[in-house]
Amino acid sequence: GDYPIEENTEEDNWRFVERSMAMKPMKPVIDGEPIYEEIPHGLHDENELLWKDYDVRRYAYWSVFAGSFGHTYGHNSIMQFIKPGVGGAYGAKKPWYDALNDPGYNQMKYLKNLMLTFPFFERVPDQSVIAGQNGERYDRAIATRGNDYLMVYNYTGRPMEVDFSKISGAKKNAWWYTTKDGKLEYIGEFDNGVHKFQHDSGYSSGNDHVLIVVDSSKDYVKKDCYQINTHE
């Protein structure tokens, strides 16, 4: 049959999650094999660029915010259990136990901690949270929300407009969440309506953050909190 993925959308794994979520009857969705950290873009040509931690984060947050119930992480060396004296495919040379120190591997826990900080089973994907025009490819913002909280993942740090009226509460508290280290930065309290945001670090690919907005009557996150608690 025809190739099911439109040209130039191969990296947009949020599209595949949305497509699966729209099927009837609805079933749980997960991206079972996204990219692998430190594997070549073209897979078989080890001279191509390697997928890095920022790519791993993009695939993970896009997928989960679009509706996946979890995420699958992979590493080129770990999946092959590369070690001295044992050759591997796809240009893998790093021993698997050294790969356990790679950044993408160690940053996945920050996504888990974020998701489990808020009511998990009421959370839904909701792109109507994004007001105005959304971006294409890496500039696309992906939104998810519960009844009294919302989150928007922004991979490039581009300016975006967010509609606070999509959740409960006349007043809202907002934070930036850094996906690289799980750090929180309180932005302030806001009235309802549409508000424009851009992280102070500016625009660049891989400069990714999550905007968190919460009904001010809720205390999922404290204003003076600088790190979301670990959820085992």
Give the residues covered by each predicted segment:
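Short, P/G- and charge-enriched loop/turn segments at secondary-structure junctions
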Residues: 17, 198-200
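Aromatic- and carboxylate-lined catalytic core of secreted/periplasmic carbohydrate-active enzymes
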Residues: 25-28, 37-39, 54-188, 200-231
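Substrate-binding/catalytic cleft of secreted carbohydrate-active enzymes
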Residues: 1-60
